[in-house]
A protein has these predicted regions:
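ER/Golgi luminal nucleotide-sugar-dependent glycosyltransferases, focusing on the catalytic module
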Residues: 2-357
């Protein structure tokens, strides 16, 4: 049997340690940012390639960020880029890969305005920065979407998802929001209305953002910092699945399980998972709430890292195929092929969540 009291005590101690570390983040981030600014470059573009540009007259632009250690463009990426074009976006494809062969470029060229191949300095936010800098009419756009390949999907038509956008109530919008560090919209899929694009705060944020190769810094100053900068400018955010609404649904599910615990609740890590949710700790919604997001909120994506690595030890993850199939006809073999290729490349055994139906 799992000792829930012991797991709760461990989680409380870990949270106290995390809170102590957070006290030093501002100083650490200031020093890292200062160093990044000393090495300031206008961009890190290796090559700018014209593509088919099938939507020349579209007023909506998308920056799609890609990384693959071998420079391959997998089927799930082609599916995403074509879905953006189908939804009316003029796509700039930005790859941080160490190489980008011609056959990879050819796979997505028909759906894109252009392709930017760059050095992987600054990670996704460095790529977003260079992609945005390539758009000459930014302040005249009807909307800008930032998206990256850290998710699988979409499991639904993006036009349907984006039909929920309402520029009268929000200036920028995303699939999920988070309270880790500070409140922010998660940037794997983030849309900006003209009110956001035209505010000086938006341009200043990207102009001043240094290229930094330190992932925690990029999360705190890129992902979190972007939303916080826009909030300070008086802009409003919207989201498909509001954090506390989703969290309350998960809490209700866990409370129900207390009286009728299924055998799976004895899985290692379940007590820790339960403690974090019922203790109202800020968690990553795309990991902790992944299934409710898909089934109850129509979330069209699942995080790649969740299936590949499951870093938070989320229980019941082997259900991911069934959950996706319950709401979509998405071809999950695209996910399996991609992750099995990476496992073979790295010489690892495939994650059971990938190979076990």
């Amino acid at each position: 049997m799992i000792d829930h009291a012991k797991e709760t005590a461990k989680e409380t101690a870990k949270e106290a340690a995390r809170a102590l570390r957070r006290r030093y983040f501002p100083l650490q981030d200031s020093l890292i940012g200062m160093f990044g600014r000393l090495l300031r470059r206008s961009n890190l573009v290796r090559e700018h390639i014209a593509a088919a540009d099938p939507l020349k007259d579209s007023g909506r632009a998308a920056i799609y960020v890609h990384f693959d250690p071998d420079g391959q463009v997998d089927d799930y990426v082609v599916h995403q880029v074509s879905a953006l074009a189908d939804a009316g976006f003029r796509v700039t494809f930005v790859s941080n890969s160490p190489t980008l062969p011609h056959d990879s470029r050819a796979r997505i060229s028909a759906f894109c305005k252009d392709i930017i191949w760059r050095f992987n300095t600054g990670y996704d936010f460095g790529a977003y920065k260079d992609g945005i800098a390539s758009i000459s009419n930014l302040d005249r756009l009807d909307g800008l979407l930032l998206m990256n390949d850290s998710v699988y999907g979409p499991f639904r038509q993006l036009r349907e998802v984006l039909s929920r956008l309402d520029g009268s109530t929000a200036d920028f919008w995303g699939i999920a929001d988070s309270f880790e560090y500070q409140h922010h919209i998660q940037t794997f899929f983030m849309f900006f209305f003209p009110a956001a694009l035209q505010t000086p705060a938006f341009g200043r944020f990207w102009a001043r953002l240094p290229y930094v190769n330190h992932k925690p810094w990029v999360i705190r100053n890129g992902e979190v910092g972007l939303s916080q900068r826009l909030y300070r400018a008086g802009l409003r955010s919207g989201v498909l699945a509001p954090y506390w609404s989703v969290a309350e649904k998960m809490k209700a599910r866990l409370e129900d399980m207390k009286g009728n615990a299924p055998p799976q609740s004895q899985q290692p890590g379940f007590a820790r998972f339960q403690s974090r949710i019922l203790g109202n700790r800020a968690v990553n919604p795309m990991q902790y709430f992944w299934d409710i997001l898909i089934t109850d909120y129509g979330c069209p994506f699942i995080k790649r890292e969740l299936i590949q690595l499951n870093p938070a030890g989320i229980p019941f993850l082997s259900r991911w195929r069934a959950v996706v199939a319950s709401r979509s006809e998405y071809d999950t073999s695209m996910i399996e092929r991609h992750l099995q290729r990476l496992d073979r490349r790295d010489g690892h055994d495939a994650n059971p969540a990938v190979i076990s139906p």
